[in-house]
């Protein structure tokens, strides 16, 4: 079976599960959950006789206990694949401390760091909504906390087992404007129609939408949370408030009354992103040097960088093959 057909088999839904950062030395990135799910299939197409580096985004918040479970899993994999090398890219400094305490290779590089800022812009358009909430209809998102906002835009879908939560949320927020789904390249258009972005969960990952608001120049009202979205928050343009619908609404209208500068919000967000990207670049630069690679990853970065590092991004397979795989000579199926 060829590499392409093997990958195509587990990318049937056109969801990317890994991305190549470097072919020589071979460096892959993936979400930790996706790596575990697809390890058996990855084994068929990645070489077993040379060192390989994996950089994992950790997804949802990882407690110290969960980090110990990850450490045990890594030890198990190392027994079978001693040439595999693992790095974890953490969404918060707290989580990074847990990983380092456990003796695992890790850096503080929030997955929102790898949003392509060029997909988002500040637009001079009329503000139709007081706030926008880009969030799937799932219990953790706590849509009901937006019930006291007068002009509200909600964008999000739901899974079959979330239908009850969806129906109850729609009943509570029957005044809101709803859109089930918007293509990612157009999401900034809708964000620019709102004054404020909402982030109302208390526990998840870094929440891409939170940073997408900021890159579109929107201030944010957030509740206290675990998961790392606050890595991009600054008091000048974010209000973190208690999970009470009246308090949330008050914060929204205060930001509307005294709006922060949109260009400043975007510029500060990109500054934070670039700082965290540099952490990844520095680590891979060190790998290059130890491998005797006569290249500079800082230069390679501009060539390999893609929105969200290509992870869980819906891209037609022909584009995946030509742009993401780059006709790799390293990734050959085992004979």
Regions found by a protein language model. Name each.
Residues 114-188:
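Conserved catalytic-core segment of nucleotide-activated headgroup transferases in glycan assembly
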Residues 138-141, 199-210, 224-225, 229-232:
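Nucleotide-sugar-dependent
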Residues 192-205, 218:
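Acidic donor-binding loop of glycosyltransferase active sites
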Residues 183-194, 215:
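Short acidic alpha-helix that forms the nucleotide-activated donor recognition element
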Residues 243, 256-319:
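A charged, aromatic-enriched C-terminal amphipathic alpha-helix characteristic of glycosyltransferases
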Residues 32, 38-139:
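Catalytic core of nucleotide-activated saccharide and alditol-phosphate transferases
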Residues 219-223:
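Short hydrophobic beta-strand element within catalytic cores of glycosyltransferases
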Residues 234-246, 254-259:
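Conserved acidic donor-binding segment of nucleotide-sugar-dependent glycosyltransferases
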């Amino acid at each position: 079976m060829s590499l392409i057909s093997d990958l195509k088999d587990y990318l049937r839904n056109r969801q990317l599960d890994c991305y190549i950062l470097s072919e020589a030395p071979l460096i892959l990135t993936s979400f930790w959950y996706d790596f575990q799910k697809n390890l058996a299939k990855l084994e068929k197409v990645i070489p077993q006789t040379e060192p390989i580096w994996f950089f994992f985004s950790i997804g949802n918040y990882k407690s110290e206990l969960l980090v110990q479970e990850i450490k045990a899993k890594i030890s198990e994999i190392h027994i079978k694949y001693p040439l595999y090398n693992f790095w974890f890219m953490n969404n918060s400094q707290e989580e990074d401390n847990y990983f380092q305490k456990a003796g695992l290779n890790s850096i503080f590089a929030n997955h929102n760091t790898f949003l392509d800022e060029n997909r988002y812009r500040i637009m001079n358009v009329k503000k139709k909504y007081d706030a926008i909430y880009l969030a799937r209809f799932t219990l953790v998102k706590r849509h009901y906390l937006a019930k006291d906002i007068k002009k509200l835009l909600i964008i999000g879908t739901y899974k079959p087992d979330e239908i009850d939560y969806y129906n109850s949320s729609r009943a509570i927020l029957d005044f809101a404007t709803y859109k089930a789904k918007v293509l990612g390249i157009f999401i900034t258009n809708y964000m620019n129609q709102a004054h404020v972005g909402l982030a109302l969960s208390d526990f998840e990952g870094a929440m891409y939408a939170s940073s997408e608001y900021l890159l579109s120049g929107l201030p944010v009202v957030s509740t206290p949370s675990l998961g790392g979205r606050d890595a991009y928050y600054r008091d000048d343009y974010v209000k973190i408030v208690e999970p009470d619908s009246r308090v949330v609404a008050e914060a929204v209208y205060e930001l509307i009354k005294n709006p922060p500068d949109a260009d400043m919000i975007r510029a500060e967000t990109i500054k934070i992103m670039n700082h965290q990207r540099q952490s990844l670049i520095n680590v891979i630069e060190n790998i290059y040097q130890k491998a005797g690679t006569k290249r500079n990853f800082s230069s390679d970065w501009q060539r390999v960088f893609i929105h969200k590092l290509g992870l869980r991004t819906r891209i037609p397979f022909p584009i995946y093959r030509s742009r993401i795989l780059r006709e790799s000579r390293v990734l050959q199926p085992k004979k």
